[in-house]
Amino acid sequence: MPKGNRTIIHLVSSAGTGYVYTTTKNKRKSQEKLQLRKYDPRVRKHVLFVEGKP
């Protein structure tokens, strides 16, 4: 079976709470680090999540 072109990444909260989302991204089409604004339940706000080490 061929290996897919998607890799598992972790999105780490920029609020410093240590909260992490796990998702996948296409390693061929998106070379830059992913940044998304998502909900962090530890601070009860939407904050910026940046791609960190898995």
Swiss-Prot record:
The keyword Ribonucleoprotein applies. The keyword Plastid does not apply. GO terms for molecular function: structural constituent of ribosome. One of its GO terms (biological process) is translation. InterPro entries: Ribosomal_bL33 (IPR001705), Ribosomal_bL33_CS (IPR018264), Ribosomal_bL33_sf (IPR038584), Ribosomal_zn-bd (IPR011332). It holds the Pfam family Ribosomal_L33. Keywords: Ribonucleoprotein, Ribosomal protein. It comes from the Bacteria. GO terms for cellular component: cytosolic large ribosomal subunit. Belongs to the bacterial ribosomal protein bL33 family. NCBIfam families: PRK00595.1 (NF001860), rpmG_bact (TIGR01023). This is Large ribosomal subunit protein bL33B.
